[in-house]
């Protein structure tokens, strides 16, 4: 037997009637026609919305205050570290300046070595005067520049000396004095090279005068001799009807040209010697400036010497005190040994005779 299917709008499952929905509201007529065991549904309850001014919140004032305190402590830490950072920056700047001066000193030393090699040459035909003059001028300018840079470095140390520690200031002054001593040594070497160059120029001049003295002394006699020869040649030419060749003008022009070359060479050497003398004078002024700078460092060196002497006296006093303490400890040790021996003797007597 096939069951009968009932079709409904919502309360069906594949055409099978399931019954009334629990949420279905029955009308009064339908309620009266239903069985008596089904209870009527309660009336719908109206939902009351919450008041608009009421909302959930949490007091986070303490968290805000703690965040402010942490930020303030960070700022205070940064401000406390600012002097240290400033000192490190100043130290790096001083190091860079000293490094640059040392590099310039090494470059100038290399140029001075090249000038020394050129200045010690004594040959008349291998004299590179132009290159020597250029190197002399360049080295002189470098020495003046290095002198100014060292003075600026010393002024920097003086300006920042109050902000740095005593040991750091002493170290900086030591570096400045070392650079000054290197510059003074290089200036002294440069002065020695210029003096050698001056002596070589004097020797070359004396040699040139020695080799060119005979032609110059025979120069006044040349026109008369050449004139007599010209007259004889003129008489012979007039007698024979040939053309006379006068050699007076050509020889005179050659001798005059030789004299002009000698004069120009002597003048160039005189100018070179004057330049060398002026350079030596400038080096003397640089030595005076270096002496003044070293004199200013004399107080620091004397203070260091006094500190060394004081430290030596303190070490000697500490050594004497240590010796006294050692003697006292040694005497106390013997006293303790005596007491220990006495106790052992009493213990032996007590054990042997009284036991």
From Swiss-Prot:
Residues 28-47 are annotated as: Disordered. A motif (IxM motif) lies at residues 245-247. Keywords: Coiled coil, Golgi apparatus, Membrane, Transmembrane, Transmembrane helix, Transport. It is a single-pass type IV membrane protein. Residues 287-318 form a coiled coil. Residues 355 are vesicular. Residues 1-333 are cytoplasmic. GO terms for biological process: early endosome to Golgi transport; endoplasmic reticulum to Golgi vesicle-mediated transport; Golgi disassembly; intracellular protein transport; positive regulation of protein catabolic process; regulation of Golgi organization; vesicle docking; vesicle fusion. Residues 263-325 form the t-SNARE coiled-coil homology domain. InterPro entries: SNARE, Syntaxin, Syntaxin-5_N, Syntaxin/epimorphin_CS, T_SNARE_dom. One of its GO terms (cellular component) is endomembrane system. It is found in: Endoplasmic reticulum-Golgi intermediate compartment membrane; Golgi apparatus membrane. The keyword Transmembrane applies. Belongs to the syntaxin family. Mediates endoplasmic reticulum to Golgi transport. Together with p115/USO1 and GM130/GOLGA2, involved in vesicle tethering and fusion at the cis-Golgi membrane to maintain the stacked and inter-connected structure of the Golgi apparatus. Part of a ternary complex containing STX5A, NSFL1C and VCP. Part of a unique SNARE complex composed of the Golgi SNAREs GOSR1, GOSR2 and YKT6. This complex also includes VTI1A. Component of a SNARE complex consisting of STX5, YKT6, GOSR1 and BET1L. Interacts with BET1L. Interacts with BET1. Interacts with COG4. Interacts with GM130/GOLGA2. Interacts (via IxM motif) with SEC24C and SEC24D; mediates STX5 packaging into COPII-coated vesicles. Interacts with VLDLR; this interaction mediates VLDLR translocation from the endoplasmic reticulum to the plasma membrane. This is Syntaxin-5.
